[in-house]
Amino acid sequence: MSRLYAIILIALVFNVVMTITPDMKVEAATCEDCPEHCATQNARAKCDNDKCVCEPK
């Protein structure tokens, strides 16, 4: 029974860590939000095919 609790605890901790850790590949969906989004990453905003792309400065 303690193994079951250990597995559940590990799964919950993993879920919390994945929720807290931001996905660095996710970019802003629209070009309007692009400058603000890239400013948080200290990068240059570029709009490519209506998608925000943050390029290193």
Curated annotation (Swiss-Prot):
It comes from the Eukaryota. The keyword Secreted applies. The keyword Secreted applies. Disulfide bonds join 31-47, 34-52, 38-54. Residues 1-28 form the signal peptide. It is found in: Secreted. InterPro entries: Scorpion_toxin-like_sf (IPR036574), Toxin_alpha-KTx_8/9 (IPR008911). GO terms for molecular function: ion channel inhibitor activity; potassium channel regulator activity; toxin activity. Keywords: Disulfide bond, Ion channel impairing toxin, Neurotoxin, Potassium channel impairing toxin, Secreted, Signal, Toxin, Voltage-gated potassium channel impairing toxin. Its main location: secreted. Coiled coil: none annotated. GO terms for cellular component: extracellular region. Expressed by the venom gland. Has the structural arrangement of an alpha-helix connected to a beta-sheet by disulfide bonds (CSalpha/beta). This toxin inhibits rKv1.1/KCNA1 (100% inhibition at 3 uM), Kv1.3/KCNA3 (human, mouse and rat) (IC(50)=269-467 nM), shaker IR (60% at 3 uM) and activates the mouse capsaicin receptor TRPV1 (EC(50)=132 uM, at 20 degrees Celsius), a non-selective cation channel expressed by sensory neurons of the pain pathway. In vivo, intraplantar injection of this toxin in WT mice hind paw shows significant acute pain, whereas no pain is observed when the toxin is injected into TRPV1 KO mice. Belongs to the short scorpion toxin superfamily. Potassium channel inhibitor family. Alpha-KTx 08 subfamily. Negative results: does not block mKv1.1/KCNA1. Does not inhibit rKv1.2/KCNA2, rKv1.4/KCNA4, rKv1.5/KCNA5, rKv1.6/KCNA6, rKv11.1/KCNH2/ERG1. Shows a very weak inhibition of Kv7.1/KCNQ1 channels (4% at 10 uM). This is Potassium channel toxin alpha-KTx 8.2.
